[in-house]
């Protein structure tokens, strides 16, 4: 797969696959933070040291394959335009932090985009493995295997007492962030989410928006992840997160049934109005688009809409973001121009489903 395909395709190949509870849990991710032993962390390292790490990763891993993860493509961020960098963030293949320090940063991306390894982010390596639906345990197993493969050539910074050493103290220990992306429209509509988020934090977990820390929960999509990395094993962290996610799934399903029973016609009207907005509007901003896509996704999950697939909505969530729209237009766009193009892209994509 070429870099162009990473940029041009809105939906990653792995996202087209089925997964457990995929109507609510869109994806599972394991991210491991790792550093080279006896090397200064990227935020304090000299330029020549960052270049050394970049070149080592390129020479040892570019175009290599590990198990089902084929042809890891090495992409220096200096090769990308600002818009192309934004697209990779919108696809969750790199982080916003990596863009801010992109002069000596790079990423390795597998052919199916299920694996991305960020180089010289906050830590020397940030290893990400994604799976569709609720598959945290499988993602953990695969991330361990990938980590072991990398460690054959990389001497990690590790302390027998503290565990993996990281740039930020909150990652010391396992160096792991386990997270799931969840679509929770019924909990938002019934306002139960306001009660559940504080309760979740008491379990050492955190709830964020779609793009992680500091981001908004656009389209009723929430990221739930662990905060604690020290004093617990990776398996215990995943077990605790999975337990809470199962409870959230149950609450969301109950809320959906409750709304359907109590206000069936109103809910149906809301869903089809949103579908109409997506299908016919000429101008639409990102917030309204995200809200309407969420409504239509709910309609599909409840069996009210049968002529549109959930994958199309996953695709639209990326297609309608500012970076992707500007890539599509092949030029910078003012906000009002983006709103016009966004409406056009959505109309065209929905017509293909008819």
From Swiss-Prot:
Question: By its UniProt entry, which CDD domains does this protein fall under?
Answer: bacterial_phosphagen_kinase
GO cellular component terms, semicolon-separated: extracellular space
What is catalysed by this protein? L-arginyl-[protein] + ATP = N(omega)-phospho-L-arginyl-[protein] + ADP + H(+)
Q: Give the first-level EC class, as a single word.
A: transferase
Modulation of this protein's activity: Appears to be allosterically activated by the binding of pArg-containing polypeptides to the pArg-binding pocket localized in the C-terminal domain of McsB.
**Quick check: keyword Transferase in the entry?**
yes
Q: Which NCBIfam families match?
A: PRK01059.1-4, PRK01059.1-5
- Protein task: Catalyzes the specific phosphorylation of arginine residues in a large number of proteins. Is part of the bacterial stress response system. Protein arginine phosphorylation has a physiologically important role and is involved in the regulation of many critical cellular processes, such as protein homeostasis, motility, competence, and stringent and stress responses, by regulating gene expression and protein activity.
Question: What is this protein called in UniProt?
Answer: Protein-arginine kinase
């Amino acid at each position: 797969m070429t870099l162009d395909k990473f940029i041009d395709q809105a939906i990653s190949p792995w996202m087209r696959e089925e997964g457990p509870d995929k109507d609510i849990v869109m994806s599972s991710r394991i991210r491991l933070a790792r550093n080279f032993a006896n090397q200064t962390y990227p935020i304090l390292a000299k330029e020549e040291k960052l270049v050394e790490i970049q070149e080592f990763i390129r020479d040892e891993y570019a175009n290599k394959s590990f198990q089902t993860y084929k042809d890891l493509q090495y992409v220096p961020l200096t090769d990308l335009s600002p818009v192309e960098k934004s697209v990779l963030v919108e696809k969750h293949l790199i982080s916003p932090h990596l863009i801010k320090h992109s002069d000596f940063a790079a990423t390795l991306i597998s052919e199916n985009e299920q694996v991305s390894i960020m180089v010289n982010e906050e830590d020397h390596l940030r290893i990400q493995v994604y799976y569709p639906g609720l598959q945290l345990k499988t993602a953990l197993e695969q991330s361990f295997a990938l980590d072991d493969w990398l460690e054959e050539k990389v001497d990690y910074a590790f302390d027998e007492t503290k565990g993996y050493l990281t740039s930020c103290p909150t990652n010391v220990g396992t160096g792991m962030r386990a997270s799931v992306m969840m679509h929770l429209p019924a909990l938002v509509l019934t306002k139960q989410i306001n009660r559940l988020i504080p309760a979740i934090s008491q379990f050492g977990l955190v709830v964020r928006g779609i793009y992680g820390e500091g981001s908004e929960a656009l389209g009723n999509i929430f990221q739930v992840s662990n905060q604690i990395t020290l004093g617990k094993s990776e398996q215990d962290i995943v077990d605790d997160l999975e337990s809470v996610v199962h409870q959230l799934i149950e609450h969301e399903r109950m809320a959906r049934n409750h709304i359907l029973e109590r206000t069936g016609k109103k809910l149906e009207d809301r869903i089809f109005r949103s579908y109409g907005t997506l299908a016919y509007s000429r101008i639409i901003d990102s917030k309204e688009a995200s809200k309407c896509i969420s409504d239509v996704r709910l309609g599909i999950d409840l069996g009210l809409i049968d002529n549109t697939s959930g994958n199309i909505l996953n695709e639209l969530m990326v297609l309608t973001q500012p970076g992707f729209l500007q890539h599509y237009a092949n030029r910078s766009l003012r906000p009002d121009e983006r709103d016009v193009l966004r409406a056009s892209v959505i109309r065209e994509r929905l017509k293909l489903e008819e």
